[in-house]
Amino acid sequence: MITPVEWEKQARADREAIFFYLYEEAGVLVATATDDKFVSMVDILRENPLAGTKTGSAEKQRKLVVPRFPFIIVYVVENTSIRILRVLHTSRKIAGRYNKS
C-alpha cells in the first residue's frame, strides 16, 4: 500500500536551504543528487511508513537516516498519511528542531 506524504512548511524550507547551500558550495550535480536522495527515501516511507526509528523525544515522531549522506528525515505517521517535519544535517541535535504536532 502506498501512503500519501505531506511535506510540512519547515521541511520544504529545510530541503530548499540544503539544495541552495550545496549548489553554491559543490555545484548543481551534488545539490540535485542530494535532493533526489531525499525523494527516494520518502518513496521508501510511502511503502513502509515505519522504516525509520523513533526519535525518543516523542511517541509518534520518527527519523529516517539518509544512507551515505549526512542527513536525517524527521516525520510523523498519521492514520492515513505521513507528514515530513524536518530534513536535518546529522551534526544538529534533533530535540527542539521540529514543530511538535
Language model regions located:
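Short, hydrophobic secondary-structure boundary micro-motifs
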Residues: 31, 53-55, 96
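Enriched for short, Lys/Arg-rich terminal
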Residues: 70-72, 76-101
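Catalytic cores of transferase enzymes with a strong primary signal for eukaryotic protein kinases
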Residues: 14-19, 51, 61, 91, ...
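Basic/aromatic recognition patch in beta-strand/loop cores that engages polyanionic ligands
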Residues: 39, 47-81
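Arg/Lys-rich, positively charged N-terminal/basic patches that mediate binding to nucleic acids
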Residues: 1-35
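Short amphipathic alpha-helical/adjacent loop interface patches that line ligand
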Residues: 15, 35-38, 42, 68
